[in-house]
Regions:
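N-terminal targeting leaders characterized by basic, low-complexity, disordered sequences
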Residues: 1-29
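Hydrophobic membrane-insertion alpha-helices, especially the h-region
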Residues: 51-68
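Aromatic (tryptophan-biased) beta-strands that constitute blades/sheets of beta-rich domains
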Residues: 73-90, 113, 117-126, 156-162, ...
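Repeated scaffold domains used in trafficking and secretory/extracellular systems
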Residues: 87-96, 124-136, 163-175, 207-217, ...
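Structural motif
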Residues: 108-110, 146-150, 185-191, 232-244, ...
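Structured, soluble extracytoplasmic/luminal domains of envelope-associated proteins
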Residues: 119-173, 297-300, 307-314, 318-325, ...
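Solenoidal tandem-repeat scaffolds enriched in leucines and small polar residues
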Residues: 187-280
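Residue-level detector of conserved catalytic or cofactor/ligand-binding positions
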Residues: 358-367
Length: 367
């Protein structure tokens, strides 16, 4: 009996051990399955995060590649789409207006589409017409004369007969125009609507603030930029003044909200480039920023003599003479924050240079 009892206890002990082993094995299998499920869930979450990130990275790469392509591409040939014979090639001039060609001479202005079909044509009488275009608006002034016409893509919108000879006229995208008039001892800077009505006039003196060299208008049609030049202690000095004809400038003397003096510097040309303005100097350029009260943003000075300038809303270009026999010229193009984008030597004789509306490439007219 004792032997049987011992045998039963051993068998019971063995069965209990096998049961515990089986339970442990089953528990381990369940734990592994749970672990596998956790790993799969983590992988799914990781994929859900990585997929949009990958899409964004691909999109950024495509945009960057496209940007670099547009910035660095160059054109080495062209295709003539259509030609037209012009009888008076000496006095007729051309520029762009609303994606079409604005053709003007001493007695007529017309808008021509890309098939050289005349959209409209109107007449006037001038001796030395000079045009300025901004967006869908334009002004044609008789330089050293007294006539101006304002126009948009639909035709002439207004005319003006001035009391003094016209030095220069500029227009803004909103249709506001400004003109420098030479009255001898005094000069006038007049401000006009696109219909030709006078908004404001400002008389200037050669001694103070100086002789107006150029005028430019902001896109908002409220701020006017003027470059003056005067002689101070036998030194040529330039003064850049910003006039505000809105509420901001109503309490300021002569509506001048900001002004900057540059000793020993000549500023023959100024221009608004979108929200920024630039003063093109004989030693480089200065950029201004601010819609109502413009402030100096950056000045870029160069040592070489500048022989040409060109620009659009995103770029400022300078051309210098090059000492190299193989390359006569050097072109430098800057962003409107003053950073140099590229510099390139070239050897193409030209009479005019500008930024093209297509691809922002520089266009040259051969001599």
């Amino acid at each position: 009996n004792t032997f049987k009892n011992i045998k039963k206890k051993l068998r019971r002990k063995r069965l209990l051990a096998e049961k515990r082993h089986l339970e442990k094995a089953q528990a381990g299998a369940g734990g592994n399955e749970a672990a596998r499920r956790k790993i799969k869930a983590a992988l799914r979450r990781k994929k859900a995060v990585l997929k949009p990130v990958a899409v964004i990275l691909i999109a950024v790469f495509v945009v960057l590649a496209g940007f670099l392509f547009l910035e660095k591409r160059t054109y080495r040939n062209y295709k003539v789409q259509v030609t037209s014979e012009q009888e008076d090639t000496v006095s007729t001039q051309y520029t762009y207006l609303s994606g079409k060609i604005l053709r003007y001479s001493s007695d007529e202005v017309s808008l021509v589409n890309n098939k050289l079909e005349t959209v409209w044509s109107q007449t006037y009488d001038m001796q030395n017409p000079v045009a300025d275009v901004c967006g869908d608006c334009a002004v044609i002034a008789d330089k050293d004369g007294t006539s101006m016409v304002f126009l948009d893509k639909n035709g002439i919108t207004g005319t003006v007969s001035t009391s003094y000879s016209i030095v220069k006229a500029k227009v803004s995208k909103t249709g506001m125009a400004a003109a420098i008039l030479d009255g001898g001892d005094h000069t006038w800077i007049n401000f006009y609507n696109l219909d030709g009505s006078l908004v404001a006039e400002n008389q200037t003196n050669i001694q103070d603030p100086g002789y107006p060299m150029d005028v430019a208008l902001a896109d908002n049609g409220v701020v006017m930029m003027v470059a003056y030049q005067f002689v101070d202690s036998s030194e040529t000095t330039s003064y850049i003044a910003f006039y505000n004809f809105g509420e901001v400038g109503q309490n300021e003397d002569d509506r001048i909200v900001s002004g900057y003096t540059y000793d020993g510097v000549v500023v023959p040309q100024i221009q608004y480039l979108g929200s920024n303005a630039v003063a093109l100097r004989d030693d480089g350029f200065t950029i201004y920023s601010g819609r109502q009260i413009p402030k100096e943003l950056k000045t870029v000075q160069v040592e070489q003599e500048i022989i040409s300038t060109f620009y659009d809303e995103n770029n400022i270009g300078l051309v210098f003479k090059n000492d190299s026999k193989d390359k006569q010229y050097t072109m430098q193009v800057y962003a409107t924050d003053g950073k140099l984008k590229f510099s390139k030597d070239f050897n193409i004789p030209y009479t005019t240079i500008r930024m093209s509306e297509i691809g922002r490439a520089s266009c040259r007219e051969r001599v």
